[in-house]
């Protein structure tokens, strides 16, 4: 108990502590350089800590993970708290069209942001997808949301305390466990993930599925049974006739109910995949993970060939993190495309603002994760891997001659040469087609441009891939059912709004997809170059001694700068931004043009939001500027004085933030040196000398500041532009 109160006080919590930072950081802020060093090194437990044993680093990694969980719990608690006290969730369950849970208080007129969402409720329109998620979970009252908010808050406090406890208080046995990466065995984690997936399937089957079945049949949410009532067999037999015979029979009843795994297509009541399919998915994913984990634990890997890398990967935090980030990022991007192709949440597919927000959000997450994978792969190559030909490295590890890493480094020039060739070929041809179209259209020769009405470029391979699901089901379904029964094929309408439909692919899609290929390959080129040449290059053979980040390589080498692995990550983020900007722009315009819209029953025609203009106008660069960026920015530019004015202010402020970044990205260190010295001279002249001495930004620090503001400004601008447009269209 005495040990507990020794550490639970504000003095210890606010103290930097020599065991958590190196000597320079532990001294506190003497100059402004300390601030930048803190940003750069606070989470670099291997380098910034005075105690950097494997055990202490493991404890800090574990603690930071718990702290992250605390933030996630706090965020979830906030979402559920707002849903419980400030939302129209109960009304939304009866008429699921315009969710809102962010009531703005009037201080100097901010209440103009509260839009009329129906049912005498005014709020900001939310597009997070939480209402649809809660409905899928089986939450039907705002009291349930209060319970969830309280549970999330308890979880946040518990994980925050656990993070602090593991960071400051430790035992030798636990440190040894955390220092060993075998504690985070992939097989064990797979089994845990499988158990979690099956647990979630159990919740869906026993709670969510019965409640959603009653909601779909028109039962008022206030008349629904409580979740604990569903644990009794009598009520379940009313909802699912024949229930209660035995586990095997019960499971088959769930699967054979309308809307379970034997059905294809979307639930006509909700415009989403049947919940029974989703429960089956989680159940079988869980089984697969458990079997895979058991196999991974039982099978002893061979020591020959590629598995000689096992020691390097198993003993490196950065290699594990790099692989996990790449996988998680790829899964996030995959989920982004599932949101519109196969909507899994009730009433989400017809809520265009939510679909757009979730797509863009998960695309950005995936992009940043993948760039992070490149960053930590570079750090792994520098800190955790040895040198070629079996020579011991400074870290004391050996490099296997026949390993995958050795093979990659031996062939890195060939790999990069091919990547460079592919990138240049894609870029020249893809942009060349656009420039050709702009030029000939400007010269009044529309018959000579690439378009569906003149010189066609048909995406034959894409159309074939698009048809594969329907071809796969031809053996089980007959006639049109093979096509219309699959989400994304045929037409799915909910309350007069198009949820999914077949996308016509033509010349415009062929052109923009090659731009996607170019930008993705360019991003990969930069990140791969940073990884493969992180230890040495032709100009700088001793990169390994310079570390992960350094501004230039020193005198006598021709002034080669921007060659560090950090600089490759820096440039990779920009190209990732380019890649994803084109992806989300393409998605937003394509969906407005060819998918989203209103189905007119009398004429049996779809009135799309932009009238199918994508194939006509997106084949020129001028069309992207005129018909997409300028034309569709009308809502955000003209938002002042309306409920969308908040997006107008964000649009303006984010532009300023983006422009501010250019001052850091286009100026050298000399500019900052002169500026700081001038300001210092003025302060000394006036005898106003700060305690924390100003220092000019280094080259790397300036680039980092510019990068952060560029990303914040660009993403903020895009966010305001998209949401102002889609919310205005949704409400109107």
From Swiss-Prot:
Quote the subcellular location field of this record.
Plastid, Chloroplast thylakoid membrane
Q: Does the keyword Cell cycle apply?
A: no
* Family annotation (InterPro entries): PSI_PsaA, PSI_PsaA/B, PSI_PsaA/B_CS, PSI_PsaA/B_sf
Q: What is one cellular component GO term in this UniProt entry?
A: photosystem I
What PANTHER family does the database record attribute to this sequence?
OUTER MEMBRANE PROTEIN, OMPA-RELATED (PTHR30128), PHOTOSYSTEM I P700 CHLOROPHYLL A APOPROTEIN A1-RELATED (PTHR30128:SF19)
Query: Which organism is the protein's source?
Result: Heterocapsa triquetra (Dinoflagellate)
Q: Where are the transmembrane segments?
A: 61-84, 145-168, 185-209, 278-296, 317-340, 356-382, 414-436, 510-528, 568-589, 644-666, 704-724
Q: Main subcellular localization, coarse class?
A: plastid
Its membrane topology, per UniProt?
A: Multi-pass membrane protein
Q: What does this protein do?
A: PsaA and PsaB bind P700, the primary electron donor of photosystem I (PSI), as well as the electron acceptors A0, A1 and FX. PSI is a plastocyanin/cytochrome c6-ferredoxin oxidoreductase, converting photonic excitation into a charge separation, which transfers an electron from the donor P700 chlorophyll pair to the spectroscopically characterized acceptors A0, A1, FX, FA and FB in turn. Oxidized P700 is reduced on the lumenal side of the thylakoid membrane by plastocyanin or cytochrome c6.
**Would you tell me the protein name for this molecule?**
Photosystem I P700 chlorophyll a apoprotein A1
Pfam families reported for this sequence: PsaA_PsaB
Q: What's the source species' lineage?
A: Eukaryota, Sar, Alveolata, Dinophyceae, Peridiniales
- Encoded by which gene? psaA
Q: Which residues bind phylloquinone?
A: 672
């Amino acid at each position: 108990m005495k040990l507990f109160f020794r550490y639970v006080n504000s003095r210890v919590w606010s103290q930097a502590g020599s065991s958590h930072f190196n000597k320079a950081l532990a001294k506190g802020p003497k100059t402004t350089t300390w601030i930048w060093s803190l940003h750069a090194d606070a989470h670099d437990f291997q380098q910034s800590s005075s105690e950097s044993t494997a055990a202490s680093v493991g404890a800090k990694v574990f603690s930071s993970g718990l702290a992250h969980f605390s933030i996630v719990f706090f965020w979830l608690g906030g979402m559920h708290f707002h849903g419980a006290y400030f939302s129209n969730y109960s009304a939304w369950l009866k008429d699921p069209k315009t969710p809102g849970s962010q009531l703005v208080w009037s201080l100097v007129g901010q209440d103009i942001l509260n839009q009329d969402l129906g049912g005498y409720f005014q709020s900001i329109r939310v597009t997070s997808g939480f209402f649809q998620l809660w409905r899928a979970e089986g939450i039907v009252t705002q009291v349930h949301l209060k319970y969830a908010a309280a549970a999330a808050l308890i979880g946040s406090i518990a994980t925050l305390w656990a993070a602090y406890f593991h960071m400051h208080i430790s035992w030798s046995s636990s440190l040894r466990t955390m220092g060993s990466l075998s504690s985070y065995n992939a097989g064990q984690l797979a089994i845990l993930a499988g158990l979690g997936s099956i647990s979630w399937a159990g919740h869906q089957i026993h709670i969510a599925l019965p409640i959603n079945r009653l909601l779909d049949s028109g039962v008022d949410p206030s008349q629904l049974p409580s979740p604990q009532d569903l644990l009794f067999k009598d009520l379940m037999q009313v909802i699912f006739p024949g229930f209660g015979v035995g586990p095997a029979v019960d499971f088959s009843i769930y699967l054979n109910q309308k809307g379970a795994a034997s059905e294809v297509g979307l639930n006509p009541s909700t415009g989403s995949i049947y919940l029974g399919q989703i429960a089956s998915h989680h159940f079988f994913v869980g089984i697969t993970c458990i079997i895979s984990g058991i196999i991974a634990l039982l099978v002893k890997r061979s020591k020959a060939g590629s598995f000689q890398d096992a020691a390097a990967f198993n003993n490196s935090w950065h290699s594990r993190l790099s692989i996990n980030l790449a996988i998680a990022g790829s899964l996030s991007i995959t989920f982004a495309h599932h949101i519109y192709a196969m909507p899994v949440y009730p009433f989400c597919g017809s809520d265009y603002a939510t679909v757009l927000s979730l797509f863009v959000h998960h695309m950005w997450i995936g992009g940043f994760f993948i760039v992070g994978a490149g960053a930590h792969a570079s750090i792994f190559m520098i800190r955790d891997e040895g040198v070629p030909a079996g020579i011991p490295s400074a870290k004391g590890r050996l490099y296997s001659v026949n390993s995958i890493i050795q093979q990659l480094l031996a062939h890195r020039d060939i790999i990069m040469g091919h990547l460079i060739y592919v990138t240049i070929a894609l870029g020249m041809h893809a942009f060349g087609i656009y420039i050709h179209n702009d030029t000939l259209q400007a010269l009044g020769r529309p018959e000579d441009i690439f378009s569906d009405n003149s010189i066609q470029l048909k995406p034959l391979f894409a159309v074939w891939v698009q048809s594969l699901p329907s071809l796969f089901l031809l053996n089980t379904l007959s006639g049109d059912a093979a096509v219309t029964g699959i989400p994304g094929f045929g037409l799915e309408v909910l309350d007069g709004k198009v949820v999914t439909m077949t996308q016509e692919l033509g010349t415009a899609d062929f052109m923009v997809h090659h731009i996607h290929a170019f930008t993705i390959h360019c991003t990969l080129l930069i990140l791969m170059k940073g990884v493969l040449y992180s230890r040495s290059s032709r100009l700088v053979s001793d990169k390994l001694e310079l570390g992960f980040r350094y501004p230039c390589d020193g005198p006598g080498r021709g002034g080669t700068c921007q060659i560090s692995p950090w600089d490759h990550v820096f440039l990779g983020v920009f190209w990732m931004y380019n890649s994803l900007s084109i992806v989300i722009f393409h998605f937003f315009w394509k969906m407005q043009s060819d998918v989203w819209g209103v189905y007119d029953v009398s004429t049996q025609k779809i009135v799309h939001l932009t009238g199918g203009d994508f194939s006509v106008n997106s084949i020129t660069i001028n069309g992207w500027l005129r018909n997409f960026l300028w034309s569709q920015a009308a809502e955000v530019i003209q938002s002042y004085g309306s409920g969308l004015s908040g997006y107008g202010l964000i649009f303006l402020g984010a532009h300023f933030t983006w422009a501010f970044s250019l001052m850091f990205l286009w100026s050298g260190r000399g500019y900052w040196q002169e500026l700081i010295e001038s300001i210092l001279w003025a302060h000394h002249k006036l005898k106003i000398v700060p305690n924390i001495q100003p220092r000019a930004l280094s080259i790397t620090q300036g680039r980092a500041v510019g990068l952060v503001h560029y990303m914040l400004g660009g993403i903020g601008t895009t966010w305001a532009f998209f949401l102002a447009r889609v919310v205005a269209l949704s409400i109107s």
